């Protein structure tokens, strides 16, 4: 029942929300938001377990799949679509699914989140298998679409995890690893796009970033697999080469082009004074880790 969910409680600090000044509303929201990172920190051990599973999936040719409805689904898609430009992943390696399909990203699809079968169809459509990791996201922890997806993921032998914002969440019973970030009552009663959504975004940031570090997508704290899909990212790529090798802009630009705009290869070429082909071989032998290639 909804009344048992802490995300549905009324916030005692905002009972007169409609009478507050704009500044008071903003102060109240900011005060509540400060609690989110603390709540996330309490789940760190569980988040670490998820990251280890995701890294294992990636190392064995598997994928990371997010499933959710409404805000939760949108956050999963948001995290997934940022992976190719940031980490140079194939667009199939990290995917997000939302109840009702992509049209539900911008407009609510009535009844979609209440159907377990829709999630099963979505996961069958990508030939989900035992190499993959599926993460179900739902603030309530009881959305049927997400529950259906987790059941099917377990059935095919995939690794499963859940992210909810209520303790004792129903979907935690279906996931091999469960994260329950208890964010409590929202400023606006039941509006889980607020603190609950913020908590989910923080957890997803951790999972994708730490997992990508674990498969060699980062050198020091530089995104060395960045894809230069626009002029801003072209310039960022050159700056990354400069930071990693301490060469000037002109030399970084020259090696960037010599390396066919492959930032990792350019860094290895400069630091080891080798040719492009040799740099690629060293990176291959090092499974993509720049530090190991050096």
UniProtKB/Swiss-Prot annotation:
The active site is at residues 82, 113. One of its GO terms (biological process) is amino sugar catabolic process. Pathway: Amino-sugar metabolism; N-acetylmuramate degradation. Residues 54-217 form the SIS domain. GO terms for molecular function: carbohydrate derivative binding; carbon-oxygen lyase activity; ether hydrolase activity. The keyword Ligase does not apply. InterPro entries: Etherase_MurQ, Glucokinase_regulatory_CS, MURQ/GCKR, SIS_dom, SIS_dom_sf. Keywords: Carbohydrate metabolism, Lyase. It catalyses: N-acetyl-D-muramate 6-phosphate + H2O = N-acetyl-D-glucosamine 6-phosphate + (R)-lactate. Homodimer. A lyase-type mechanism (elimination/hydration) is suggested for the cleavage of the lactyl ether bond of MurNAc 6-phosphate, with the formation of an alpha,beta-unsaturated aldehyde intermediate with (E)-stereochemistry, followed by the syn addition of water to give product. Specifically catalyzes the cleavage of the D-lactyl ether substituent of MurNAc 6-phosphate, producing GlcNAc 6-phosphate and D-lactate. This is N-acetylmuramic acid 6-phosphate etherase. It comes from Bacillus cytotoxicus (strain DSM 22905 / CIP 110041 / 391-98 / NVH 391-98).
